[in-house]
Amino acid sequence: MVENPMVINNWHDKLTETDVQIDFYGDEVTPVDDYVIDGGEIILRENLERYLREQLGFEFKNAQ
């Protein structure tokens, strides 16, 4: 019996699949996501305000 690599590798080709990246808050980063890198940490754009506030002490205010 011939061993099929698709069956052996759980139907995935490990050589052509990209590694999944995880941002600072544990969210998966896909190739189409917008993100920033700060000191080696990946932060998704939707988590950026939270990161700036919690990690860097930024204060966001409204001009009123």
Curated annotation (Swiss-Prot):
It holds the Pfam family Yqai. Gene3D superfamilies: YqaI domain. This is Uncharacterized protein YqaI. It comes from Bacillus subtilis (strain 168). Transmembrane segments: none annotated. Signal peptide: none annotated.
